[in-house]
Amino acid sequence: VQVISSYDQFKQVTGGDKVVVIDFWATWCGPCKMIGPVFEKISDTPAGDKVGFYKVDVDEQSQIAQEVGIRAMPTFVFFKNGQKIDTVVGADPSKLQAAITQHSA
């Protein structure tokens, strides 16, 4: 899982033809801390080889969070070819796993 630390990096990461999932989180968000390790664990599964895993701190990268329309944390957003293709809102491991499985197929 890589941290996105600039808007340019965000555009580069989301613009490719590989599906990427970005965890939009905040340091002060309890549920984010709870699901963070789950996100890391899923990235180490076979699905993780087919999907790029990234994190964005919404406080450090407010421009990205605003452009994507993040209103709650954590929010997991899937991108392919520069387009948002799916969103999972909240710290729900089974929903997150299901979406990652679906997009890695």
From Swiss-Prot:
Q: Which SUPFAM superfamilies match?
A: Thioredoxin-like
Give residue numbers for the site Contributes to redox potential value: 30-31
Stored Pfam families: Thioredoxin (PF00085)
The entry's active site is 29 (nucleophile), 32 (nucleophile)
Q: Which residue pairs form cystines in this protein? A: 29-32
Q: Which residues form a coiled coil?
A: none
- Which UniProt keywords are present, listed alphabetically? Allergen, Disulfide bond, Redox-active center
- Tell me which domain of life the UniProt entry assigns to the organism this sequence originates from: Eukaryota
Thioredoxin domain segment(s): 1-105
Checking CDD domains in the record gives:
TRX_family (cd02947)
Q: What does this protein do?
A: Participates in various redox reactions through the reversible oxidation of its active center dithiol to a disulfide and catalyzes dithiol-disulfide exchange reactions.
Q: What's the protein here called?
A: Thioredoxin
Source organism: Malassezia sympodialis (Atopic eczema-associated yeast)
